[in-house]
């Protein structure tokens, strides 16, 4: 058998292997037939330009991947885009909501914050009031090569630069907001207070953000301590769980946790569209008698609260189970839980990469598994849930991680827009304080 005949005999077998691998690992089964035909055609093209069986298989695999990209992976990526992912040209400015952004807050400010804001404008129906030192903002835009886009969006009225002083440093005390009245976080809060923006986002000093929110916006009636609420993924991709507090209050009283539950209940109902949120109390056991004094006393308050669907204690293993819509805890415990879960996505992906087969077959299989791995990362990566809410103040405040980059900024601004567009502040303001 000459080389040409051997090549023709091996080529269909290689294509069949590719198809079997794809059928096992692809999430878009409705496009398998189209992808298979295209891959077969790619193999025929490869066969006409190679002279050995090994090069035929390699070229067929490469062309198959490039063929599947526009037919399968790109449509899947478009299907995965959230309902708020829109074309900027299709959104009228009158339909956009204004969000104030502390452009100087964060380890990567102002560059990464600005980059994320420009991406958010392209994807979400919002406009940005970007607060910061103007010269530094333009310098960062030049370094990133986004000056033309920035100027274009300024001319279109999608973004406005608002001058301020420097930010509150990460190592500064929260009380610095009273001394630095022109700090970027103070100016951003004032925009919300004046009604020029519906929500505010900052990746800067979280203590300073909380202090500025309390001093500038004030607490809601009946709320003693604001709480930071974070959205965690669950087994149900479309229904996260709200956990609060995750860092605002290290030492709590039962009354504080009671208030946290009421705040979380309203947010889950209004913004996450959960008809009757299930409230859980983070504890070391499911039984009513388990836990420390704080847990036992809080359990009694939540059990007697008629405005809540309190379903009992939630163990750590059940936080992501999908059995709870809101989980309440003190800020110390919640922050430990938050930091632990932030590492889960990256660790899991590292394990999966290490377990994938090596060699030529491994490379081909990895190509078809790429989208599956991306979806896993999307659900577990904290950058995809890049903001936490400060609930209990008279305004919508979203806190970003200090190391936030563009993707985290976009995710946080999506949360800010969602909260503002659902009118959650009206229901929070109408919340009656718990009875003593």
Curated annotation (Swiss-Prot):
It is an enzyme of class 2 (transferase). Its EC number is 2.3.1.274. GO terms for molecular function: phosphate:acyl-[acyl carrier protein] acyltransferase activity. It comes from the Bacteria. Keywords: Cytoplasm, Lipid biosynthesis, Lipid metabolism, Phospholipid biosynthesis, Phospholipid metabolism, Transferase. It is found in: Cytoplasm. One of its GO terms (biological process) is phospholipid biosynthetic process. SUPFAM superfamilies: Isocitrate/Isopropylmalate dehydrogenase-like. The keyword Signal does not apply. It catalyses: a fatty acyl-[ACP] + phosphate = an acyl phosphate + holo-[ACP]. GO terms for cellular component: cytoplasm. Pathway: Lipid metabolism; phospholipid metabolism. Catalyzes the reversible formation of acyl-phosphate (acyl-PO(4)) from acyl-[acyl-carrier-protein] (acyl-ACP). This enzyme utilizes acyl-ACP as fatty acyl donor, but not acyl-CoA. Homodimer. Probably interacts with PlsY. Belongs to the PlsX family. This is Phosphate acyltransferase. The lineage of its organism: Bacteria, Bacillati, Cyanobacteriota, Cyanophyceae, Synechococcales.
